[in-house]
A protein has these predicted regions:
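Alpha-helical segment of the N-proximal tetratricopeptide repeat
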Residues: 6-43, 47-54
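Structural signature of tandem alpha-helical TPR/SEL1-like repeats
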Residues: 21-32, 55-67, 89-101, 123-135, ...
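Helix-start (N-cap) detector for alpha-helical repeat units in TPR-like alpha-solenoids
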Residues: 8-9, 42-43, 76-77, 110-111, ...
Length: 196
């Protein structure tokens, strides 16, 4: 057990604060201290793994996510995070397989559909990636980055009207967030697609 008056809550709070500041190695130490209080804490395991990804320690991240999955095999977050680790490794088949396992548990998870789409796109399975992005958008259509990723896949298919539509939607979402430079960029891409 950690000493110095630390509690699980204090360790988690400190770890999250450090991670937000980009101090991932120090955050990892605090997550490890949190896990001394509760070795099966899913939040700590998942966040520990994400911190490992940010500093390029994918093997350690996958280990943390595997522990989370072993503890709670019906919680989709471990699968989503493990898929992210595989994506950052370039292990796209593995990322797709893990995303599929997670989707069996949470078929309406936009997050898992996006990870699947990214894996398929990287495997150059463009139509399958388009289908997966469209599934993600069924459950959460508020992220302009997903619309832009879809637009890139549609661009590879030279489906210009659909490319323009996706970029225009992304532009509108950026505009709502006050991200005018991103909105303008999306509008330019939409206009280019409309002229193709």
């Amino acid at each position: 057990m950690p000493s110095d008056g630390l509690t699980l809550e204090k360790c988690m709070s400190a770890a999250r604060s450090l991670r937000q500041q980009g101090m991932n190695k120090k955050a990892i130490e605090m997550y490890r201290q949190a896990l001394q209080f509760d070795p099966e804490n899913l939040e700590a395991l998942n966040e520990l793994g994400l911190a490992h990804i940010h500093i390029g320690e994918q093997s350690e991240a996958i280990f943390a996510f595997d522990l989370a999955i072993d503890i709670a095999p019906n919680d989709y977050r471990g699968y989503s995070n493990k898929a992210e680790a595989f994506l950052t490794l370039g292990a796209f088949e593995d990322a797709n397989a893990v995303a599929d396992t997670g989707l069996q548990l949470a078929p309406q998870s936009s997050e898992l559909w996006i990870k699947k789409a990214r894996a398929l796109e990287s495997l150059l399975k463009i139509q399958e990636a388009v289908d997966a992005y469209n599934e993600a958008l069924k459950y959460d259509s508020s992220d302009p980055e997903v619309w832009k990723a879809l637009a890139l896949c549609l661009d590879a298919q030279q489906n210009w009207p659909a490319v323009a539509r996706a970029y225009r939607i992304a532009a509108g979402l950026h505009e709502k967030r006050g991200e005018m430079q991103d909105a303008d960029s999306c509008l330019k891409f939409a206009e280019m697609a409309e002229q193709s």
